[in-house]
Curated annotation (Swiss-Prot):
UniProt-listed CDD domains: RNaseD_exo
Membrane-spanning ranges: none
Function summary: Exonuclease involved in the 3' processing of various precursor tRNAs. Initiates hydrolysis at the 3'-terminus of an RNA molecule and releases 5'-mononucleotides.
Protein name: Ribonuclease D
Gene (name only): rnd
Known EC number: 3.1.13.5
Any single biological process term in GO: tRNA 3'-end processing
SUPFAM superfamilies recorded: HRDC-like, Ribonuclease H-like
PROSITE patterns per the UniProt record, alphabetical: HRDC
Organism from which the protein derives: Musicola paradisiaca (strain Ech703)
């Protein structure tokens, strides 16, 4: 397939200007995320139905034309399994494409598995077998090989015609508005940024700690997340999660004690002093300053029975609607609903199972179940 490699600001401006004359475009990104907190953008693929462009972010400095395209309300942006691509756009440009449609969400409303891959979709709709051998390539290395470019180009070349068909099929099936709603919810999830002071709640065994020990974990997790974002490093490359838990549990007072708890040499060398300072700060806190204990949801009274009732309702709705139970409600969504209902976690948005298309489909009977679990 023919493509052009865009390496200049003028070239980007020209292809974005043309793309904005079209009603829809297909987008994809290639990125690297091994030791970093944020994804490192390596390539952007853009197909407007006439011109296929591979945009090299390493050589472009003026991104306003591309941002204007992403925000153009007259141009629908199609991606497949776009969750990580949205994160890339947020990190690189501080915005999300709109209007945005994820074709993986569309096929889920047409009866395919929730994580239906792009290669399988192309095989189904285009009778083409994609070469996925470049999927683990280093997209930050230059120059890009012809094989890399062909691999990247295929992702949008086949996506656009399939997307148009999938919109028609989803509309005919009566699920178009629900699918759009699900795409909006995906965007909302990507914009919900974890507050550092709440990071301790994401630590696996936080529910085992109380009082001063939990206060210490809160300080440690807050510091680690801020440091990871500041240095653009994966959090476990700062200090491993299990080591944070050990420090909070035993409240060490020396570098030697950190080593005895299993912390690595680099962790102690680079961060040992800071960890000990945070432990010392905890020792001077008043009990009134300690965070509330983290409740282990699965041990909460009534959890197992409530979860089972909700799963039964979801299965009934799946059979009635023709949608998969997996699409209707994941375990994570059910757990968030119950945590919200019992006020076990900070209250933010209304849970997804009670809002949007899910709320319209089975929100009332779901509220009926929740009413039995005060």
């Amino acid at each position: 397939m023919n493509y052009q490699l865009i390496t200049t600001d003028d070239g980007l401006s020209e292809v974005c200007s043309q793309a904005r004359r079209m009603p829809q475009v297909a987008l994809d990104t290639e990125f690297v995320r091994t030791r970093t907190y944020y994804p490192q953008l390596g390539l952007i693929q853009l197909f407007d139905g006439e011109r296929l462009s591979l945009i090299d972010p390493l050589s472009i400095t003026v991104w306003q034309p591309f941002c204007d395209l992403l925000l153009d309300p007259a141009v629908t942006k199609y991606l497949h399994a776009g969750s990580e691509d949205l994160e890339v756009f947020l990190n690189a440009f501080g915005l999300l494409p709109t209007p945005f449609v994820d074709t993986q969400i569309l096929v889920a409303f047409l009866g395919k598995p929730l994580s239906y891959g792009f290669a399988a979709l192309v095989a189904d709709y285009m009778q083409v077998t994609l070469d996925k051998s470049e999927s683990r390539t280093d997209w930050l290395a230059r120059p890009l090989s012809e094989k890399q470019c062909q691999y990247a180009a295929a992702d949008v070349y086949y996506l656009l015609p399939m997307a148009i068909r999938l919109v028609e099929e989803t509309t005919s099936a009566g699920w178009w508005e629900a699918a759009l709603d699900e795409c909006r919810q995906l965007c909302q999830r990507k914009q919900d940024v974890l507050a550092p002071e709440q990071a301790y709640r994401e630590i696996g065994n936080a529910w085992q700690l109380k009082g001063r020990h939990l206060a210490c974990l809160q300080k440690l997790a807050d510091w680690r997340l801020r440091k990871a974002r500041e240095r653009d490093s994966a959090v476990n490359f700062i200090v491993r999660e299990e080591h944070l838990g050990q420090v909070a549990r035993y409240l060490p007072g020396s570098l030697g004690e950190l080593g005895a708890l299993g912390l690595s040499g680099p962790e102690i060398r680079y961060h040992g002093k800071t960890l000990l300072e945070l432990v010392a700060e905890t020792q001077t806190m008043d009990a009134a300053e300690y965070p509330e204990p983290v409740i282990n949801l699965i041990d909460y009274p009534g959890y197992k029975k409530a979860f089972r009732e909700i799963k039964d309702l979801v299965q009934q709705q799946a059979e009635r609607s023709g949608l998969s139970a997996e699409l209707l409600a994941s375990r994570r969504q059910i757990n968030r609903l119950l945590s919200w209902h019992w006020k076990l976690a900070p209250q933010t948005h209304v849970p997804e199972l009670l809002s949007g298309w899910r709320g319209r489909l089975f929100g009332e009977p779901l509220k009926g179940i929740l009413a039995n679990y005060i």
